């Protein structure tokens, strides 16, 4: 939940920065969501294969340290003043997240018994849902009171804390005898094999389709909440951060 809550600070900050750099252009603000989505989509199949070839715990630590360094570098260098830099920040943070998520998903069955796996997945899903409300509300309040830079710094700290916590966890595979080969040809064969597995099983392909439809509708909803929140005035705060945070809770 530390990461999920922290993510809202940066996501909300990027929306506000994109609006500030473009005179609150809805297209520019939507560009933040578009950059994140179009970076995730082609990248996750590749980063997912890394979790079959390299230690998952190490990948999670590296992903969080990378995101921490990126955020601190952008803050210290003042590289968040142009629309291009906001999009670049969004893209780089997605690289870290796309590396972290598959490693975390593959790590869980290695540290849980089979009868514990359902509960563990439910806790992760519940934590993600709770963090949407908690993170959005906290981010909206903090950024409206203390500014975008403070919000970005808070998220950078959550990446560092997460990396430290993960480093204390047990090894989560893959074991040396389980690791796949790392050649590019084998990696792309695995991608096509994965899609073949999905398409041959209607019950799985329906879940994948539903996930895609939910993401499309959810993205549109988030965008509308952002626009409404930026136009609303909560407690005479003109930045729109509080408005977005309250509506996203």
Regions found by a protein language model. Give the residues of each.
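Alpha-helical transmembrane-bundle signature of multi-pass membrane transport and export proteins
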Residues: 1-249
């Amino acid at each position: 939940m530390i990461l999920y809550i922290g993510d809202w600070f940066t996501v909300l900050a990027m929306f506000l920065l994109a609006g500030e750099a473009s005179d609150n252009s809805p297209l520019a603000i939507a560009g933040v969501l578009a950059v994140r989505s179009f970076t995730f989509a082609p990248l996750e199949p590749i980063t997912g294969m890394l979790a079959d070839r390299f230690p998952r715990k190490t990948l999670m630590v590296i992903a969080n340290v990378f995101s921490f360094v990126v955020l601190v570098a952008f803050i210290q260098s003042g590289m968040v003043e142009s629309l291009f830099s906001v999009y670049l920040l969004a893209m780089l943070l997605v690289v870290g997240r796309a590396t972290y998520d598959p490693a975390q998903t593959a790590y869980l069955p290695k540290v849980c018994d089979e009868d514990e796996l359902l509960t563990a997945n439910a806790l992760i899903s519940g934590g993600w849902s709770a963090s949407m409300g908690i993170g959005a509300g906290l981010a909206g309040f903090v950024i409206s009171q203390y500014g975008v830079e403070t919000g970005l710094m808070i998220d950078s700290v959550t990446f560092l804390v997460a990396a430290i916590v993960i480093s204390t966890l047990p090894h989560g595979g893959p074991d040396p005898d389980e690791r796949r080969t790392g050649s590019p040809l084998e990696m792309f064969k695995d991608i096509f094999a994965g899609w073949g597995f999905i398409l041959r099983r209607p019950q799985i392909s329906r879940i994948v389709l539903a996930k895609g439809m939910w993401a499309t509708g959810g993205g549109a909803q988030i965008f509308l909440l952002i626009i409404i929140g930026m136009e609303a005035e909560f407690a005479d705060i003109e930045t729109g951060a509080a408005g977005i945070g309250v509506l996203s809770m």
